[in-house]
Protein backbone atom coordinates (compact mmCIF):
# COMPACT_ATOMS: atom_id res chain seq x y z
CA UNK A 1 0.00 0.00 0.00
CA UNK A 2 2.87 2.39 0.79
CA UNK A 3 4.37 1.78 -2.66
CA UNK A 4 1.03 2.59 -4.29
CA UNK A 5 0.79 5.96 -2.46
CA UNK A 6 4.38 6.78 -3.37
CA UNK A 7 3.75 5.93 -7.02
CA UNK A 8 0.59 8.07 -7.13
CA UNK A 9 2.43 10.99 -5.51
CA UNK A 10 5.31 10.66 -7.99
CA UNK A 11 2.91 10.43 -10.94
CA UNK A 12 1.00 13.54 -9.83
CA UNK A 13 4.29 15.39 -9.33
CA UNK A 14 5.39 14.58 -12.87
CA UNK A 15 2.00 15.54 -14.26
CA UNK A 16 1.72 18.91 -12.51
CA UNK A 17 5.36 19.97 -12.28
CA UNK A 18 4.97 22.32 -15.24
CA UNK A 19 4.44 26.01 -14.61
CA UNK A 20 1.91 26.30 -17.45
CA UNK A 21 -1.22 24.28 -16.85
CA UNK A 22 -3.57 25.10 -19.74
CA UNK A 23 -3.47 26.43 -23.28
CA UNK A 24 -5.84 28.67 -25.22
CA UNK A 25 -6.08 26.68 -28.44
CA UNK A 26 -7.20 27.97 -31.84
CA UNK A 27 -8.08 26.00 -34.96
CA UNK A 28 -7.17 28.47 -37.72
CA UNK A 29 -9.53 27.22 -40.43
CA UNK A 30 -12.72 27.13 -38.31
CA UNK A 31 -15.39 29.65 -37.41
CA UNK A 32 -14.99 31.93 -34.35
CA UNK A 33 -17.06 29.58 -32.15
CA UNK A 34 -14.10 27.17 -32.11
CA UNK A 35 -11.44 29.87 -32.19
CA UNK A 36 -10.55 29.98 -28.51
CA UNK A 37 -10.83 26.79 -26.46
CA UNK A 38 -8.91 26.28 -23.21
CA UNK A 39 -7.24 22.86 -23.03
CA UNK A 40 -5.84 21.62 -19.72
CA UNK A 41 -2.34 20.16 -19.76
CA UNK A 42 -2.25 16.37 -20.33
CA UNK A 43 -6.04 16.08 -20.82
CA UNK A 44 -7.52 14.77 -24.08
CA UNK A 45 -9.94 17.50 -25.20
CA UNK A 46 -12.22 17.84 -28.20
CA UNK A 47 -11.67 21.13 -30.03
CA UNK A 48 -13.89 21.78 -33.05
CA UNK A 49 -14.47 18.08 -33.68
CA UNK A 50 -10.79 17.14 -33.33
CA UNK A 51 -9.00 15.69 -30.31
CA UNK A 52 -5.90 17.38 -28.89
CA UNK A 53 -3.61 16.98 -25.93
CA UNK A 54 -0.66 19.00 -24.55
CA UNK A 55 1.91 16.53 -23.21
CA UNK A 56 4.40 17.98 -20.69
CA UNK A 57 8.12 17.32 -21.05
CA UNK A 58 9.57 15.34 -18.14
CA UNK A 59 12.77 17.40 -17.92
CA UNK A 60 11.81 20.95 -18.99
CA UNK A 61 8.88 22.46 -17.08
CA UNK A 62 8.14 24.94 -19.88
CA UNK A 63 8.30 22.51 -22.81
CA UNK A 64 5.27 20.67 -24.23
CA UNK A 65 4.32 18.52 -27.19
CA UNK A 66 1.06 19.38 -28.90
CA UNK A 67 -0.65 16.28 -30.31
CA UNK A 68 -3.76 15.97 -32.49
CA UNK A 69 -5.52 12.60 -32.68
CA UNK A 70 -8.07 11.31 -35.16
CA UNK A 71 -10.18 9.73 -32.39
CA UNK A 72 -10.78 10.44 -28.73
CA UNK A 73 -8.09 7.88 -27.85
CA UNK A 74 -5.44 10.40 -26.75
CA UNK A 75 -3.10 7.83 -25.25
CA UNK A 76 0.62 7.26 -25.52
CA UNK A 77 -0.01 4.05 -27.45
CA UNK A 78 -1.91 5.84 -30.24
CA UNK A 79 0.22 7.71 -32.77
CA UNK A 80 -1.04 11.28 -33.15
CA UNK A 81 -1.86 12.66 -36.61
CA UNK A 82 -0.02 15.93 -35.82
CA UNK A 83 2.71 16.66 -33.25
CA UNK A 84 4.69 19.76 -32.50
CA UNK A 85 7.08 20.43 -29.61
CA UNK A 86 7.34 23.99 -28.30
CA UNK A 87 8.54 25.95 -25.27
CA UNK A 88 6.38 28.39 -23.33
CA UNK A 89 8.03 31.73 -22.54
CA UNK A 90 5.08 33.88 -21.47
CA UNK A 91 1.28 34.01 -21.42
CA UNK A 92 0.83 36.16 -24.53
CA UNK A 93 2.93 34.61 -27.34
CA UNK A 94 1.06 32.43 -29.80
CA UNK A 95 2.79 29.20 -30.89
CA UNK A 96 2.20 27.72 -34.35
CA UNK A 97 1.23 24.10 -33.75
CA UNK A 98 1.19 22.63 -37.22
CA UNK A 99 -0.58 24.12 -40.23
CA UNK A 100 -4.03 24.42 -38.59
CA UNK A 101 -3.38 25.04 -34.92
CA UNK A 102 -2.00 27.71 -32.63
CA UNK A 103 -1.84 27.92 -28.86
CA UNK A 104 -1.05 30.36 -26.07
CA UNK A 105 0.44 29.05 -22.81
CA UNK A 106 -1.52 29.99 -19.68
CA UNK A 107 -1.12 29.70 -15.92
CA UNK A 108 -4.13 29.37 -13.68
CA UNK A 109 -4.22 32.44 -11.47
CA UNK A 110 -3.88 31.77 -7.78
CA UNK A 111 -6.23 33.93 -5.75
CA UNK A 112 -4.72 36.18 -3.13
CA UNK A 113 -5.11 34.77 0.37
CA UNK A 114 -8.06 36.06 2.33
CA UNK A 115 -7.18 37.21 5.81
CA UNK A 116 -9.92 36.61 8.31
CA UNK A 117 -9.32 37.72 11.89
CA UNK A 118 -9.83 34.90 14.35
CA UNK A 119 -10.54 37.18 17.31
CA UNK A 120 -12.39 40.45 17.15
CA UNK A 121 -11.13 42.64 19.96
CA UNK A 122 -13.75 44.20 22.19
CA UNK A 123 -12.91 47.42 23.95
CA UNK A 124 -14.82 48.14 27.13
CA UNK A 125 -14.09 51.55 28.54
CA UNK A 126 -13.49 51.72 32.28
CA UNK A 127 -14.62 54.91 33.96
CA UNK A 128 -13.23 55.69 37.39
CA UNK A 129 -15.11 58.55 38.98
CA UNK A 130 -13.01 61.21 40.61
CA UNK A 131 -14.30 62.06 44.07
CA UNK A 132 -15.20 65.67 44.53
CA UNK A 133 -15.13 67.53 47.75
CA UNK A 134 -18.64 68.51 48.55
CA UNK A 135 -18.71 71.36 51.00
CA UNK A 136 -20.85 70.88 54.04
CA UNK A 137 -23.99 72.92 53.78
CA UNK A 138 -24.02 75.92 55.94
CA UNK A 139 -27.13 76.43 57.94
CA UNK A 140 -29.40 79.01 56.57
CA UNK A 141 -29.34 82.19 58.56
CA UNK A 142 -32.95 82.91 57.84
CA UNK A 143 -34.26 79.67 59.28
CA UNK A 144 -35.19 79.76 62.89
CA UNK A 145 -36.46 76.22 63.11
CA UNK A 146 -33.96 73.61 64.23
CA UNK A 147 -34.46 69.88 64.01
CA UNK A 148 -37.34 70.10 61.60
CA UNK A 149 -38.21 67.11 59.44
CA UNK A 150 -36.94 68.80 56.28
CA UNK A 151 -33.51 69.36 57.82
CA UNK A 152 -33.31 65.75 58.95
CA UNK A 153 -34.27 64.49 55.47
CA UNK A 154 -31.75 66.82 53.82
CA UNK A 155 -28.99 65.72 56.20
CA UNK A 156 -29.85 62.07 55.70
CA UNK A 157 -29.84 62.52 51.91
CA UNK A 158 -26.44 64.19 52.06
CA UNK A 159 -25.03 61.33 54.15
CA UNK A 160 -26.38 58.71 51.72
CA UNK A 161 -25.05 60.65 48.71
CA UNK A 162 -21.60 60.87 50.35
CA UNK A 163 -21.63 57.12 51.04
CA UNK A 164 -22.54 56.33 47.44
CA UNK A 165 -19.74 58.56 46.17
CA UNK A 166 -17.24 56.85 48.44
CA UNK A 167 -18.24 53.44 47.02
CA UNK A 168 -17.51 54.52 43.49
Swiss-Prot record:
Provide this UniProt record's keywords sorted from A to Z. Actin-binding, Cell membrane, Glycoprotein, GPI-anchor, Lipoprotein, Membrane, Repeat, Signal
How this chain sits in the membrane, per its record, is: Lipid-anchor; GPI-anchor
Q: Where are the sequence repeats?
A: 116-119, 120-123, 124-127
Q: Where is this region: Disordered?
A: 116-147
Region of interest: 3 X 4 AA tandem repeats of T-P-T-V: 116-127
PTM characteristics: O-glycosylated in the repeat region. The oligosaccharides contain N-acetylglucosamine and fucose as the major constituents. The GPI-like-anchor contains a phosphoceramide group, rather than a phosphatidyl group.
Q: Which residues are glycosylated?
A: 110, 114, 116, 118, 120, 122, 124, 126, 128, 130, 132, 134, 138, 140
Q: Which GO terms describe its molecular function?
A: actin binding
Question: What does this chain do?
Answer: May bind F-actin and nucleates actin assembly.
- What family classification does the UniProt entry report for this protein? Belongs to the ponticulin family.
Report what the protein is called: Prespore-specific protein A
Q: Which species is this UniProt entry from?
A: Dictyostelium discoideum
